[in-house]
């Protein structure tokens, strides 16, 4: 067995980053909800 989480900064940004969220309407909804909730960090 090996560790399943192999962190990569670039991949994380690409998948869960701000620009990716802004591209889709559902992504923008996520950002809106997180702003509403008062999250300190909106995205990865």
UniProtKB/Swiss-Prot annotation:
GO CC field: ribonucleoprotein complex; ribosome
UniProt keyword list: Ribonucleoprotein, Ribosomal protein
Residue intervals passing through the bilayer: none
Ranges of biased composition (kind: Basic residues): 7-23, 30-44
InterPro entries membership: Ribosomal_bL34, Ribosomal_bL34_CS
Region forming the signal peptide: none
UniProt keyword Chloroplast present: no
The UniProt record lists the keyword Chloroplast: no
Disordered, as annotated region: 1-44
Molecular function in Gene Ontology: structural constituent of ribosome
GO process terms (BP): translation
Protein family: Belongs to the bacterial ribosomal protein bL34 family.
Protein name: Large ribosomal subunit protein bL34
Native species: Clostridium botulinum (strain Hall / ATCC 3502 / NCTC 13319 / Type A)
